[in-house]
Amino acid sequence: MVSKSRWKLLAMLALVLVVMVWYSISREDRYIELFYFPIPEKKEPCLQGEAESKASKLFGNYSRDQPIFLRLEDYFWVKTPSAYELPYGTKGSEDLLLRVLAITSSSIPKNIQSLRCRRCVVVGNGHRLRNSSLGDAINKYDVVIRLNNAPVAGYEGDVGSKTTMRLFYPESAHFDPKVENNPDTLLVLVAFKAMDFHWIETILSDKKRVRKGFWKQPPLIWDVNPKQIRILNPFFMEIAADKLLSLPMQQPRKIKQKPTTGLLAITLALHLCDLVHIAGFGYPDAYNKKQTIHYYEQITLKSMAGSGHNVSQEALAIKRMLEMGAIKNLTSF
């Protein structure tokens, strides 16, 4: 006959097992709820100021007073010089920047500026977008932000065809601006170094091209309308690096860690928009050497060696934003 103490032990073990199973299920549901936001049949309500309030909690002492794009009037008479050099400020690059701002623009399109509540999606370049069929849903957002040279032509079913803004830097400008963008797309230069300003000036003014000072040769011919070019305020790079990744603003020359264009775009969207969704973010696990990282090309994590990006640290930052509801994800993360 089984003793009472034996029965008590078995009952306790069974209870522990039930609790463990319940906790596992609840955690799995919570993970899905936090990090994967299926496309709703109806538009999600857009609450004015929602992203701003979440950003304030995320970034601390945060203000929307900063302009999104650098403006000529702020550099014609510089009253408060920037504290940092590129990519976190413009210290030492003011004269070159002034020439670029004189031939580009800094305005936000009226159709975006006039929106009472701005619904935005940041479309990453991740492999998760392949066969996602998110194209129609992406096209319905007020603002669609794309990154670098990610193609649209041929992938419309998965990534959509609308492009409000495309963030790029010289080395990532290897795309046809007329094929991969819309006629009114804003091409937003993310400057990492003074040579980036020099490059865009020579392209737009048809001056002698610069070939040195880049880790990859940028285009020498680039058919764009100067009035579609914007220069991103380095403030957003500073916020992404400092508040999201805790990177020091002054780093040894050999280290030079910096945020990816994707994390930078999310930071920008939280400043510009009232509702922020993301799609196509995330990288394979470090041990997965064969999984491609982009939806449009066959390259792996190995290609990011020496890039100065800490993708694991960025993943934690994005998950933190997802957990607090500052952003929502249209693809798994």
Swiss-Prot record:
Regions of this protein lying in the Lumenal compartment: 27-333
Stated role: A beta-galactoside alpha2-3 sialyltransferase involved in terminal sialylation of glycoproteins and glycolipids. Catalyzes the transfer of sialic acid (N-acetyl-neuraminic acid; Neu5Ac) from the nucleotide sugar donor CMP-Neu5Ac onto acceptor Galbeta-(1->3)-GalNAc- and Galbeta-(1->4)-GlcNAc-terminated glycoconjugates through an alpha2-3 linkage. Plays a major role in hemostasis. Responsible for sialylation of plasma VWF/von Willebrand factor, preventing its recognition by asialoglycoprotein receptors (ASGPR) and subsequent clearance. Regulates ASGPR-mediated clearance of platelets.
Record GO biological process: cognition; glycolipid biosynthetic process; glycoprotein biosynthetic process; keratan sulfate proteoglycan biosynthetic process; lipid glycosylation; O-glycan processing; oligosaccharide biosynthetic process; positive regulation of blood coagulation
Catalytic activity: a beta-D-galactosyl-(1->3)-N-acetyl-beta-D-galactosaminyl derivative + CMP-N-acetyl-beta-neuraminate = an N-acetyl-alpha-neuraminyl-(2->3)-beta-D-galactosyl-(1->3)-N-acetyl-beta-D-galactosaminyl derivative + CMP + H(+); a beta-D-galactosyl-(1->3)-N-acetyl-alpha-D-galactosaminyl derivative + CMP-N-acetyl-beta-neuraminate = an N-acetyl-alpha-neuraminyl-(2->3)-beta-D-galactosyl-(1->3)-N-acetyl-alpha-D-galactosaminyl derivative + CMP + H(+); a beta-D-galactosyl-(1->4)-N-acetyl-beta-D-glucosaminyl derivative + CMP-N-acetyl-beta-neuraminate = an N-acetyl-alpha-neuraminyl-(2->3)-beta-D-galactosyl-(1->4)-N-acetyl-beta-D-glucosaminyl derivative + CMP + H(+); a ganglioside GM1 (d18:1(4E)) + CMP-N-acetyl-beta-neuraminate = a ganglioside GD1a (d18:1(4E)) + CMP + H(+)
Gene: ST3GAL4
Protein name: CMP-N-acetylneuraminate-beta-galactosamide-alpha-2,3-sialyltransferase 4
Primary localization: Golgi
Lipid bilayer topology: Single-pass type II membrane protein
The keyword Lipid metabolism is annotated on this UniProt entry: yes
Annotated tissue distribution: Highly expressed in adult placenta, heart and kidney.
Keyword Disulfide bond in annotation: yes
Disulfide partners: C120-C273
Pfam families attached to this UniProt entry: Glyco_transf_29
Matching PANTHER family: CMP-N-ACETYLNEURAMINATE-BETA-GALACTOSAMIDE-ALPHA-2,3-SIALYLTRANSFERASE 4, SIALYLTRANSFERASE
Residue intervals on the Cytoplasmic side: 1-8
Glycosylated position list: N61, N131, N310, N329
